[in-house]
A protein has these predicted regions:
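C-terminal catalytic subdomain
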Residues: 90, 99-166
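Helix-rich catalytic cores of soluble enzyme domains
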Residues: 1-123
Length: 166
């Protein structure tokens, strides 16, 4: 009623709460997100919406969704492509890690996901600084990820090639 933007957020865990294949999981995630878009539009025509879905695989040992897995970025990039085709903004997560402390794993996972989501063209990236499969937030992780975000933005800008610049 107040025209608040709605950010759809189903969470599909391939092989646990959704199809085991990434293609099947993305199809289910997009379908669930689109259902939410329809409900939002039925409730308030013209309501701003953003498409999104989590696609982390299930860590069977801990019973938690892995936010550091490559499948998370694969799924987010695929749903972003669908959203862009439909002219909808999209969201996802990056700068998060399965690691419990700031270490090589946390840096590698954060950097990979930040660059992957930047290249996929997501409009809104959240959960920066999340650690331990989203069970904690680390200020150190947030600061490090902020630096990586700056590097990724610079990388994605590229550079100009022209007679003047040569």
């Amino acid at each position: 009623d107040r025209f608040m933007p709605q950010m759809m957020g189903p969470s599909i865990q391939p092989g646990a709460t959704g199809p085991v294949t990434m293609a099947g999981a993305v199809a289910q995630g997009v379908a669930e997100s689109m259902f939410c878009v329809v409900v939002a539009q039925l409730r308030q025509k013209g309501c701003p919406v953003g498409l999104g879905c989590n696609f982390g695989i299930l860590d069977m040992a801990q019973g938690l969704m892995s936010i550091g897995s490559p499948e998370m970025s694969l799924g987010l990039a695929a749903q972003a492509e669908v959203a862009q085709t439909l002219g909808l903004p999209t969201w996802g997560l990056a700068g998060a890690t399965d690691a419990k402390c700031l270490d090589a794993q946390s840096g590698a996972e954060a950097a990979f996901h930040i660059l992957a989501q930047g290249q996929a063209g997501l409009n809104l990236i959240h959960d920066v600084g999340y650690m331990d499969m989203s069970m904690a937030c680390g200020v150190e992780q947030l600061v490090m990820s902020n630096d990586v975000i700056g590097m990724a933005k610079r990388f994605l800008r590229g550079f100009e090639v022209s007679d003047e610049h040569l």
